[in-house]
């Protein structure tokens, strides 16, 4: 099964719900790629010996890896951490996540400042580009096991919105402007 993504509704209900619009408005992998979001479907049961994962890591320079179990039983201050992850932010570097078990949502902003919800399930590996506004939450299952990949030592520093003057945000917006061939208002 391929990655599922859709435009979100404007509801303030529980962040762990799907938040589909009515009718549903699905988002293609091609559209995500235009935003700089990359995707691979891998075998999470064989991640330790997966040659495709090894090739991705080698090609993209991901030389650091760790595993993260997110659930109320394994994370102290779980609700507070989930709230922090759900605060809209950017990073200076790519955010690379590979879902090994469970499920959750990455939300990203498109060029028109609309939220797109990406449902991560086992086998989904995504790369969010540096400078894209995004956030993360678990879904109603309240469990996900993620592999985090980094170039070099891990740095996970969120820069909460607004960050329009941040150099990495400007670079991201410039890239969108070039890709779409039109001026894109910074969000």
UniProtKB/Swiss-Prot annotation:
List the GO cellular component terms.
cytosol; nucleus
EC primary class: oxidoreductase
Keyword line: Acetylation, Amino-acid biosynthesis, Cytoplasm, Dioxygenase, Iron, Metal-binding, Methionine biosynthesis, Nickel, Nucleus, Oxidoreductase
What Enzyme Commission number(s) apply to this enzyme? 1.13.11.54, 1.13.11.53
* Pathway in which the depicted protein is active: Amino-acid biosynthesis; L-methionine biosynthesis via salvage pathway; L-methionine from S-methyl-5-thio-alpha-D-ribose 1-phosphate: step 5/6
Question: Domain of life here?
Answer: Eukaryota
Q: Any idea which positions bind Fe(2+)?
A: 89, 91, 95, 134
N-acetylalanine modification sites are 2
Is Chloroplast a UniProt keyword of this protein? no
Q: What is its main location?
A: cytoplasm
For this UniProt entry, which segments traverse the membrane? none
Q: Which Pfam families match?
A: ARD
A GO MF annotation of the entry reads: acireductone dioxygenase (Ni2+-requiring) activity
Keyword Protease included in the entry's annotation: no
Question: In which residues is Ni(2+) bound?
Answer: 89, 91, 95, 134
Family to which the UniProt record says this protein belongs: Belongs to the acireductone dioxygenase (ARD) family.
Sorted alphabetically, which PANTHER family does this protein's record hold? ACIREDUCTONE DIOXYGENASE, ACIREDUCTONE DIOXYGENASE 4
Please state what the protein is called.
Answer: Acireductone dioxygenase 4
Q: What species is this protein from?
A: Arabidopsis thaliana
